[in-house]
Every structure is written in structure tokens, then in C-alpha cells.
């Protein structure tokens, strides 16, 4: 039986935390900032944790991620 491979696109977008959670960065950060307030832009810089409903599916793609 072959080993399951890590989904490389997902590996570039998520990092595992020390407690086993998954850290992600926010969407809507590449352009069109003139339509966003300073507060929105500031909050978009912060990382966020993966929601519990998505955790199981994303974890399956990142089987061998350290």
C-alpha cells in the first residue's frame, strides 16, 4: 500500500501550532484595499485558527506535515 502524500498547496497555506491546531492566514488581502477600512485591513494581517468544522478535512490533506 503506498503512503498517503501531503497536499502541497495546503501545506503552503497552513501551519501546525504547538498544541496541534492549524493556523491559517486571512483571505481578501492581495488588492482593492481602498474599499476597506483601516480596522478591516489591520485585522486581515492577523493569523487565525482553522474552524472546527473544517479541521478534520484539512488535517487529512496534511497527513505528514510537521
UniProtKB/Swiss-Prot annotation:
Any Gene Ontology biological process: translation
Molecular function, one GO term: structural constituent of ribosome
SUPFAM superfamilies attached to this UniProt entry: L35p-like
Biased composition (Basic residues): 1-16
Disordered: region residues: 1-21
Domain of life: Bacteria
Pfam families per the UniProt record, alphabetical: Ribosomal_L35p (PF01632)
Listed Gene3D superfamilies: 4.10.410.60
CC annotations in GO: cytosolic large ribosomal subunit
InterPro entries, per the entry: Ribosomal_bL35 (IPR001706), Ribosomal_bL35-like (IPR021137), Ribosomal_bL35_CS (IPR018265), Ribosomal_bL35_sf (IPR037229)
Entry keyword set: Ribonucleoprotein, Ribosomal protein
Name by which UniProt lists this protein: Large ribosomal subunit protein bL35
Amino acid at each position: 500500500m503506498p503512503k498517503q502524500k501531503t497536499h502541497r498547496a495546503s501545506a503552503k497555506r497552513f501551519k501546525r501550532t504547538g498544541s496541534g491546531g492549524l493556523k491559517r492566514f486571512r483571505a481578501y488581502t492581495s488588492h482593492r484595499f481602498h474599499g476597506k477600512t483601516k480596522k478591516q485591513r489591520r485585522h486581515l494581517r492577523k493569523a487565525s485558527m482553522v474552524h472546527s468544522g473544517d479541521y478534520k478535512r484539512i488535517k487529512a490533506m496534511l497527513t505528514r506535515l510537521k
